[in-house]
């Protein structure tokens, strides 16, 4: 016990000990039971004390559901080496509570055992074998783990110095946690629970009906409480603020990020789930689930793969085992990629960003440079439809819903999340994809009906449209960047315009990478990596700040990249650009935006076709069918997403007109 803690408490008086004994309380050594001044012994009943015990005041009552009130105190419990904060209620502990500090106004009822057994780091330092089930890409789990740090540890194994130094930084944090004494934060609620061993519990946590918790941290905070529910079993785990683990979920060697939900018997081992993941019913093994990885279905297995912004259809499955050297294979589905019902992928494979996988695929394609594609199966053959997802209203709906569904309320956010559908990361892939498709057509000939790429087949019509869709998206992104850059600029002379277009930073040139949610220039990421390797970064806090700064300055860096690509793609020197050239870019941007929006509008209209009404108006004629459909689904023109598309066309057209108006005097 610290000196400060001794000063706060005093020994029991003989009179207080007498009253406690009258209430069927006992102690191995009453001299080791200390209390705060103002202590009243009447609210302690049938309790045994051993080791050192420190008791706060019992002055408040707890109002429980059903109109029940319970006064704070100790009832039918056993405490060993425990400090109890003010106004706690601890009752009906079937076995004992040992080696814990319990925060004020916590409620603990009907539990079996809560103990710390020897020195522990409370789930920090657990090696999580992600991606490769047999090991080799272990991520060191700890309380403050971000998706980006985990990405370094799992993906950058070709830089052993980085891995070594990053682990060194993290172990510095972990070793500071090492203790033989645990904490239960203030206002925690723990009821009807089995065994809790070596678990650190944050303030305002709710643990109700949980079966067993072993070696972990529940990092609840007031602004973002953690909730654990009935029949949950967790071993070697960390659960971050704002997350909910419910109804029979079983976790082993897992990190759960902020604002995640796992429920309905979900089972996971050796997996990482970062911000806003939602997992129900299914199973995960050795997955790197970046932000917004979602699965709801009992028949879905996610294994040995990396995801983010992903939705898994029912029956989605993958294999990391070819029955030769064991489960050693892995896969990557880049941000926004998703699977349809009953899809299957035999790893290794790499699926491009914002692509959709349908059917069974066993030929190990690498399609990272063909984003926004459909990967479908026909007659046991993989067919690729490049770029088609750019005109899918579902893609736009996804992009709009992710920011709205960010449920993080903790002011300290672990993950830096970029929601942009079009970014230097995806546009550089489209530029590569356009080159690939153009070269395929040149080499195989324009008269070919089928083209082959990475063990996938591409129909001639799909290839032609894919080039067109990529060009539309490139025009849209580069035009958006240009218009945004000139927003609010008084176009008094072409020199003023040229000056406004000049990048304010040299950061942003070259390739960009997606660090599981954080989109950043590769050169800057490598600079951070080199600083870690050279021990220029002295602690985890400094590393996290560097990553946050990358995210904060995204748009400045984006413009540096866009500035280069505008010159390269259009063959324009922006230091000598004319008003006419800018106007041409704006017109091209506007026509591309409108064409894509019209494609989205047409795609949305399919959801209101006659075939979509099948099953409506079951006992009526076509008039009843249409009326029933409209009552349930609404009118096409009043649909939220349809209206947003039309509004987008109007807004972008007006934005283009406004800039053209400012440029008019210079033309």
PLM regions and their residue ranges:
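Long, compositionally biased intrinsically disordered regions
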Residues: 111, 378-667
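Long, charge-dense tracts
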Residues: 95-96, 100-102, 106-107, 112-122, ...
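Long, structured ligand/cofactor-binding scaffold of large enzymes
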Residues: 76, 85, 176, 193
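Glycine-rich hexapeptide-repeat left-handed beta-helix
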Residues: 2-8, 14, 19-27, 35-58, ...
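Glycine-rich adenosyl-nucleotide cofactor-binding module
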Residues: 165-185
């Amino acid at each position: 016990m610290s000196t400060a803690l001794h000063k706060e408490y005093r020994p029991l008086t003989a009179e207080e000990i007498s009253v406690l004994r009258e209430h069927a309380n006992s102690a191995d050594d009453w001299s080791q039971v200390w209390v705060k001044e103002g202590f009243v012994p009447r609210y302690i009943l049938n309790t045994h004390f051993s080791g050192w015990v420190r008791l706060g005041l019992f002055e408040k009552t707890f109002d429980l559901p059903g109109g029940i009130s319970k006064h704070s105190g100790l009832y039918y419990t056993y405490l060993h080496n425990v400090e109890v904060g003010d106004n706690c209620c601890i009752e009906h502990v079937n076995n004992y509570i040992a080696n814990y500090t319990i925060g004020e106004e916590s409620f603990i009822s009907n539990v079996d055992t809560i103990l710390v057994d020897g020195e522990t780091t409370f789930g920090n330092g657990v090696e999580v074998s992600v991606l490769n089930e047999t090991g080799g890409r272990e991520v060191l789990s700890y309380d403050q783990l971000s998706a980006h740090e985990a990405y370094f540890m799992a993906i950058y194994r070709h830089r052993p110095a980085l891995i070594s130094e990053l682990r060194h930084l993290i172990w510095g944090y972990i070793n500071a946690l090492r203790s033989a004494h645990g904490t239960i934060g203030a206002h925690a609620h723990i009821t009807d629970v089995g065994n809790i061993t070596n678990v650190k519990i944050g303030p305002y946590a709710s643990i109700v009906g949980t079966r067993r918790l072993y070696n972990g941290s529940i990092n609840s905070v007031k602004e973002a409480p953690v909730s654990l529910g009935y029949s949950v079993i967790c071993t070697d785990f960390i659960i971050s603020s704002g997350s909910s683990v419910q109804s029979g979920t079983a976790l082993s060697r897992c990190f759960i990020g902020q604002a995640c939900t796992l429920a309905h018997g979900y089972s996971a081992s050796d997996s990482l789930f970062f911000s806003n993941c939602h997992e129900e019913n299914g199973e995960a093994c050795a997955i790197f689930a970046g932000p917004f990885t979602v699965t709801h279905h009992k028949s879905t297995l996610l294994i040995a793969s990396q995801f983010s912004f992903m939705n898994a259809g029912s029956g989605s499955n993958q294999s990391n085992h070819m029955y030769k050297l064991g489960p050693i294979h892995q896969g990557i589905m880049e941000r926004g990629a998703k699977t349809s019902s009953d899809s299957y992928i035999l790893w290794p494979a790499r699926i491009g960003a914002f692509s959709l996988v349908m059917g069974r695929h066993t030929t190990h394609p690498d399609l990272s440079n063909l984003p926004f594609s459909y990967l479908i199966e026909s007659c046991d053959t993989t067919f690729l439809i490049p770029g088609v997802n750019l005109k899918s209203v579902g893609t736009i709906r996804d992009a709009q819903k992710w920011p709205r569904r960010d449920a993080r309320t903790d002011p300290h956010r672990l993950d830096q999340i970029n929601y942009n559908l079009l970014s230097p990361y995806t546009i550089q892939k489209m530029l590569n994809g356009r080159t690939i498709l153009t070269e395929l057509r040149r080499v195989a000939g324009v008269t070919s009906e089928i083209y082959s790429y990475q063990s996938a087949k591409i129909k001639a019509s799909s290839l032609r449209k894919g080039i067109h869709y990529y060009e539309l998206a490139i025009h849209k992104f580069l035009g958006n960047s240009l218009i945004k850059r000139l927003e609010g600029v008084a176009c008094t002379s072409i020199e003023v315009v040229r000056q406004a277009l000049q990048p304010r930073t040299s950061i942003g040139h070259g390739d960009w990478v997606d660090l599981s949610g954080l989109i950043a220039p590769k050169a800057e990421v490598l600079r951070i990596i080199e600083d870690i390797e050279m021990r220029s970064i002295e602690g985890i806090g400094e590393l996290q700040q560097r990553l946050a700064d990358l995210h904060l300055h995204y748009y400045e860096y984006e413009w540096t990249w866009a500035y280069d690509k505008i010159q390269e793609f259009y063959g324009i020197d922006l230091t000598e650009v004319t008003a006419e050239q800018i106007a041409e870019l704006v017109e091209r941007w506007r026509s591309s935006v409108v064409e894509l929006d019209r494609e989205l509008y047409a795609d949305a209209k399919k959801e209101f076709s006659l075939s979509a009404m099948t099953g409506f108006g079951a006992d009526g004629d076509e008039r009843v069918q249409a009326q029933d459909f409209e009552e349930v689904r609404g009118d096409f023109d009043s649909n939220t997403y349809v209206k947003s598309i039309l509004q987008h066309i109007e807004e972008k057209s007006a934005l283009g007109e406004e800039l053209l108006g400012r440029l008019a005097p210079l033309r």
